[in-house]
């Protein structure tokens, strides 16, 4: 797939191609051998720039690769304590690894690519752990019925990522797309996230009180404590969500 935008969208170059020339000759001849550089470079009716490039070069010499690896696991345990009380515990684990790289060959628009090409490498890993426990109550008292649940949960998200982009800093060797070949100067970029974690702890309750199966009162309450509230005035009380319905 090819990225969008004025730099990398081949349709922009097709629309701007001179009407009096034959675009098809650039389809198979989108590159030509440069004796001075001893390698193939982009072939186009004019000098490639941020405004125009050979659309077939964009298609064949600007390459994106996305891969996702994922693993899921879940576990549920139930216990019927009495005829009117059930206990439940659940847990989920979700691991996601996203890997992306982009290869832009030398002689792509110099506005976005160094003289020897550009390489973008990104590796992101997310790890999610979720667990909850609940007690569920269902009982009749004469004309009254009570259906209620009380529980708590925890949600932990952890992220690690590394993104390297040679940008216009270029590569040491032309068209060699590896991380060690990136010229890591001030024109390049490197971003790393190590164990960025977000935790949400919650308690919740819900109840429905009925009378003769004709009138019902619904009550719910939930309180969340998020790690994003650390060092704020809300760190202890969190967020409270009540509701009442009749």
List each language-model region with its residue ranges.
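Extended, hydrophobic/aromatic-rich amphipathic alpha-helical segments that build helical scaffolds
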Residues: 75, 79, 209, 213-214
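Hydrophobic, lipid-facing positions within transmembrane beta-strands of outer-membrane proteins
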Residues: 71-75, 127-133, 201-207, 223, ...
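Exposed, low-structure sequence patches enriched in small/polar residues
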Residues: 90, 200, 206-210, 217
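Membrane-embedded beta-strand positions of outer-membrane beta-barrel proteins
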Residues: 75, 89, 148-150, 219, ...
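Surface-exposed loop/interface segments of Gram-negative outer-membrane beta-barrel transport/assembly proteins
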Residues: 1-70, 88-201, 228-235
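Short, small-residue-rich loop/turn micro-motifs
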Residues: 93, 209-211, 221-223
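Outer-membrane beta-barrel channels and translocator barrels
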Residues: 80-82, 140-142, 212
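Transmembrane beta-strand segments that form the barrel wall of outer-membrane beta-barrel proteins
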Residues: 218-229
């Amino acid at each position: 797939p090819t990225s969008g935008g004025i730099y990398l969208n081949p349709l922009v170059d097709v629309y701007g191609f001179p009407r009096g020339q034959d675009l098809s000759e650039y389809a198979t001849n989108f590159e030509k051998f440069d004796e001075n550089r001893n390698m193939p470079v982009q072939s186009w009716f004019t000098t490639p720039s941020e405004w125009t490039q050979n659309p077939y070069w964009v298609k064949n010499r600007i390459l994106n690769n996305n891969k996702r690896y994922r693993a899921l696991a879940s576990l549920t345990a139930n216990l019927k304590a009495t005829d009117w009380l059930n206990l439940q515990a659940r847990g989920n684990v979700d691991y996601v690894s996203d890997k992306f790289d982009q290869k832009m060959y030398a002689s792509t628009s110099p506005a976005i690519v160094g003289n020897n090409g550009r390489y973008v490498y990104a590796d992101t890993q997310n790890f999610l752990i979720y667990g909850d426990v609940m007690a569920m109550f269902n009982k009749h008292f004469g004309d009254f019925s009570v259906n209620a649940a009380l529980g708590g949960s925890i949600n932990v998200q952890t992220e690690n990522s590394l993104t390297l982009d040679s940008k216009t800093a270029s590569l040491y060797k032309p068209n060699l797309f590896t991380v060690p070949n990136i010229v890591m100067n001030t024109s390049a970029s490197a971003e790393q996230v190590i164990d960025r974690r977000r935790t949400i702890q919650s308690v919740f309750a819900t109840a429905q009180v009925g009378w003769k199966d004709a009138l019902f009162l619904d009550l719910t309450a939930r309180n969340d404590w998020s790690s994003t509230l650390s060092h704020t005035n809300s760190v202890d009380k969190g967020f409270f969500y009540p509701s009442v319905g009749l």
